[in-house]
A protein has these predicted regions:
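Structural motif corresponding to the early beta-alpha repeats
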Residues: 60-87, 112
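Beta/alpha (TIM)-barrel catalytic core signal, keyed to glycine-rich beta->alpha loops juxtaposed to Asp/Glu
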Residues: 13, 113-272
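Acidic (Asp/Glu)-rich catalytic clusters
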Residues: 22-25, 46-63, 98-104, 135, ...
Length: 272
């Protein structure tokens, strides 16, 4: 299953269960989370999945993605023993995620972010090796990485035994919508997931040409940005907590921008 739109669950806290159920009720079939209690409530996603299963929404109908978060991304709530070797940390976090999510497999498992910048470190390679093992054992259909730069991704593509199948990055219009990383993804058949498409780009939502596109399509500027992302080859994430916005966001699947409109936004015309 390759999703066209993903519901993100960061910062939902105690509302996570009800929001995930609302998102699936609205029509989302892909859920993104992380085993990072500082920002995510992964176990509450699992509670939602349990409730949904009882109502006939099968696990097989959903794309489920979570992440291994390195120690620097945690507060004092760490889902693994940080004194263990990195491969064991990944294994503990992965098994904890399966338990939280009431599943025996993931559709996608990501490294939440590299251990070092601008290149990859020995720690990154050790963790990637652990993700490869999980993929080979059938625990995750795809493996990938989030918050990655062009150098890191190109190195991973060139040298990894199991190539990344997913990249998830924040997208800024004034930085070309992460063009360099997206080009690597396109050339290598990697699913590019874009997050913060709205919150990182408020000027785009107010830009008169984008507002005019929304008027032409009978939607709002937010849906134009999501549709642009789809037509530019991204799989967008939304983390809205508003049930009406969930339904509105999904309308992006029903509209079509012209190639000229896509190019206009992608090449900076959508940025005032």
């Amino acid at each position: 299953m390759t999703p066209s739109f993903i519901y993100g669950t960061a910062w939902k806290k105690d509302a996570t269960t009800e929001l995930v159920k609302a998102a699936v009720g609205a029509g989302f079939r892909a859920i993104d989370t992380a085993n990072q209690p500082k920002h995510y409530s992964e176990a509450l996603v699992g509670e939602a999945l349990k409730d949904l299963a009882a109502k006939g929404v099968s696990r097989d109908s959903l794309f489920l993605q979570t992440k291994f978060t390195p120690i620097d991304g945690h507060d004092n709530r760490v889902p693994y023993d940080p004194q263990l070797p990195l491969k064991e940390q990944v294994r503990q976090s992965f098994e904890s995620s399966l338990q939280h999510l009431n599943t025996d497999r993931l559709d996608s498992y990501l490294l939440h972010g590299p251990y070092s910048y601008p290149g990859l470190s020995d720690a990154d390679w050790e963790v990637w090796g652990a993700l490869e093992d999980i993929h080979r054992s059938g625990g995750a259909g795809r493996i990938g990485i989030s918050n990655v730069n062009q150098l890191q991704l190109s190195t991973l593509v060139q040298k990894a035994s199991v190539k990344p199948a997913v990249v998830q990055n924040r997208c800024y219009a004034n930085r070309g919508w992460d063009r360099e990383v997206r080009e690597i993804c396109k050339a290598n058949g990697i699913m590019y997931q874009g997050f913060s498409l709205l919150t990182a780009n408020p000027p785009v939502l107010r830009h008169p040409p984008v507002v005019a596109m929304a008027r032409r399509c009978g939607v709002n500027p937010e849906q134009i940005v999501f549709r642009f992302a789809m037509q530019a080859g991204m799989t967008p994430l939304t983390g809205t907590t508003d049930a009406r916005h969930m339904q509105e966001d999904l309308k992006a699947l029903e509209i079509e921008l012209t190639p000229e409109e896509v190019k206009f936004i992608e090449t900076g015309g959508g940025t005032p």
